[in-house]
Amino acid sequence: MAESGGSSGGAGGGGAFGAGPGPERPNSTADKNGALKCTFSAPSHSTSLLQGLATLRAQGQLLDVVLTINREAFPAHKVVLAACSDYFRAMFTGGMREASQDVIELKGVSARGLRHIIDFAYSAEVTLDLDCVQDVLGAAVFLQMLPVVELCEEFLKAAMSVETCLNIGQMATTFSLASLRESVDAFTFRHFLQIAEEEDFLRLPLERLVFFLQSNRLQSCAEIDLFRAAVRWLQHDPARRPRASHVLCHIRFPLMQSSELVDSVQTLDIMVEDVLCRQYLLEAFNYQVLPFRQHEMQSPRTAVRSDVPSLVTFGGTPYTDSDRSVSSKVYQLPEPGARHFRELTEMEVGCSHTCVAVLDNFVYVAGGQHLQYRSGEGAVDACYRYDPHLNRWLRLQAMQESRIQFQLNVLCGMVYATGGRNRAGSLASVERYCPRRNEWGYACSLKRRTWGHAGAASGGRLYISGGYGISVEDKKALHCYDPVADQWEFKAPMSEPRVLHAMVGAGGRIYALGGRMDHVDRCFDVLAVEYYVPETDQWTSVSPMRAGQSEAGCCLLERKIYIVGGYNWRLNNVTGIVQVYNTDTDEWERDLHFPESFAGIACAPVLLPRAGTRR
């Protein structure tokens, strides 16, 4: 660093330096007398300083302390150690007796670790391998050399593999390295079954094994394989056998195949001799034998291993006069933030304008049409339940009436089908499905016949808006159903009339989106979006849609509303657009595209098993 005072000194300052990298351009200022003052910087100075200190160390010059470990000596400069390490700074400047000693014996670190630490202090470099890294990391933590700790963490993350993962995890625990621990956990969740084949797995502490087995983050793991891994760990040490139920309670036996339970689980002594393990097995058999009572048997062992909801779509139609076909495809958007849909499975029968509702992560699929009709003559009464873990369809009791362009919602553990139309015309009837009895029964009818409406449940009540009724005002109407009183009442109407639109609840609000408005012999897209607050019985307008969508699928996924496909009346055609509305920011985000241009799509948020667990 150089400073020059006076106007003439500043002009000649740059040429006064000798060989080597030139100085950076000076920062110049002038004082009130006009004198020029320049500050120069030599970028290579810190490197030169380190090199000079390393040379002094190598030549044994100006050394003022010797650190010893097990009779191995490490000469150094106190000022260098104090500048790099909080531990040494406190030792040499904090009034400790070591400050005046020439030879200091260190305890708590290895000689190999200290050698790497001192080399780093003089070079800013450390050479690591799997053989030495634990010694170096231990020394860096003990001597409070944060840069070396961070370099060791970086190395260990890069060295992570099926073979090294658990050992690295032990280091992360020993030295309280949260970031490294998170990396180890994430790697283990992705590769658990491969890691379970390693010898290190058999030495995994009980609490760590339980941590992994109880998690929803395990990927590509069938429950039968997790069971086998847990049994292998238990059988490694006979002293572990009394803890069998503590470990195996985290295996989700009800989600196994029946053949796996019979052939691979109940045949093991441990599952018969341990009282709690016998209960887990009985729970699994009961769960599978009584599918209509599975809602009553929900427990941590019946939950799908996933904590990220997927958007799942069902059916749809291309809506052309020449093609009356409907789709049987089921697509998924794997997680919020994903950009592309992929095929998940197929429905037993193709369907469009079906309605879906989710209860305990089972998807109820009801009504719709199996051939594309412009009117209600193709309406069906069929009802199915989709189990996302076993990828299995269960045919349920049919509805009392065929329905299309109706609503299906879950309320208080029951599934409600409201309104719609069929071959006989529009409907005011409301049906209620009891999962335990597998029966549909009638509830209080709507106040008037309605089809093409939208619905959402919120706060223990069911809300129905818009649709075709008997007057124009019905297209703005809001009906509210109280299941305790079994009665409907009108609430404040929407600001915009709309039919064939969507409703979804989010954060105590109920949003009405999309749809169309009829005018004489033409139809127009409704772009306006508004939300209803039940506590105040008021509607509020928010940012409008960018493109029209009616007869579209709609659902909430982590506080964002997805509107999938449908019909665009400005283009007079079906669309494959997926518009995404952020309820937190009142903004429409970048559009997605559905694989097909379909109307009559139904969609719902569903927890799906992480990749590789569906069979």
From Swiss-Prot:
UniProt region (Disordered), positions on chain: 1-35
Domain of life: Eukaryota
Keyword set includes Acetylation: yes
Kelch repeat positions: 310-361, 362-413, 414-460, 461-508, 510-559, 561-608
N-acetylalanine found at: 2
Keywords: Acetylation, Kelch repeat, Repeat
PROSITE patterns xref list: BTB
Domain BTB: 63-130
Record-annotated BACK domain positions: 165-266
Disease: Defects in KLHL26 may be cause of autosomal dominant inheritance of Ebstein's anomaly and left ventricular non-compaction.
Summary of the function given for this chain in its UniProt record: May play a role in endo(sarco)plasmic reticulum (ER/SR) mitochondrial signaling. May be part of the ubiquitin-proteasome system (UPS) and affect ubiquitination and degradation of target substrates in cardiomyocytes.
Protein name, as recorded: Kelch-like protein 26
Source organism of the structure: Homo sapiens (Human)
Gene: KLHL26
